[in-house]
């Protein structure tokens, strides 16, 4: 097996994920592995190193993103051909194999294109383009004042967030805001606990900055947890929201432990039984919660506008460092979004999306019952944009995913399952309603 000399130091502060990445890069640069070499599977390497599959998978995926590896469906991970690197003269010549055609995608991060008011959005973009005075500069580093004022009002009504425009920082996506937050918190805070499963990209970002990363459950809070907890009250990977009482308990615990809660309100507006629960930030005293909001699922994934609400103490620190940052989000899109929200267009759009996704949620659950019966168990479905299922089978989640792909259906395996049954996620955002039943019939054919 390749990578037999890969050794991990589990006593050092360097994360295991980073050690794997560095070791593979070193072997590549030293000509110990070459273009076309096939790496051990995630399962095999994690077993050999006696670590979690998630750690290996995150390392492999980061190397894919950086261009060092290629992930070929049904075949595995291969060393990519990089110019400037030495190659073995006898390196096997591999032909790229076309991935299986995906007809039904339950694993995409897109939106239903028919759900977005493209013409209306174009109208607001055109209006923003007429503001030549604002467009001639780089924009406000903290984000356009007009948008921050609008967001303060909107988030108060929609999510119960209590803040002033001055507390809001705009950025091109959550990751850019997390980078700012890391700079604000260091060196006082250099460790974080995240829910599992959670936002893997956030975990990689904190890890890459040398932070110690732990996992926790909101059901089991410990006094020994770090002073920063990354919380998604409407966790998209769990398909359920924290109840008001659970949120109050979490806030009480954070106050007692003098811990910051980093609230990622991803999908917080999508709850299908009862009204969405108010944000943690709005239920708090305003000093313990850092709030993150995004428009990637409300509007477009390509609309790179997210925002962060800082408590007063961290806002002071941000102002001390503010001169170091330029705005990463488009001024044109910020101005267009401000007008879009102020005119009530976003509120009406979210209302339509709730109806659309609630209907898809119901159709998917009904079809699962009709087609699979007791062979699947819906673990969670009350909020978010996925259903989380347990499949009554001896197969692993990876095997279920592979067999589904062979039959033209893409799904997401779940790696944090605490039960004996494999679990998967089915996203119903991008799939058409009339494709739900045929897609599930293909899954049944693939699995049973």
Tell me the role of every PLM-derived stretch.
Residues 135-258, 262, 268-270, 275-287, ...:
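Conserved core of the PLP fold type I
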Residues 111, 233-236, 297, 431:
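Short glycine-rich anion-binding loops that position phosphate/pyrophosphate groups of nucleotides
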Residues 1-127, 133-136, 147, 319, ...:
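N-terminal basic, amphipathic alpha-helical segments
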Residues 151, 307, 334-343:
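Helix-loop "lid/cap" segments that line or gate small-molecule binding pockets
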Residues 74, 284-317:
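Active-site PLP attachment segment
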Residues 105, 170, 215, 279-282, ...:
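Structural signal for conserved beta-strand scaffold positions within catalytic alpha/beta enzyme cores
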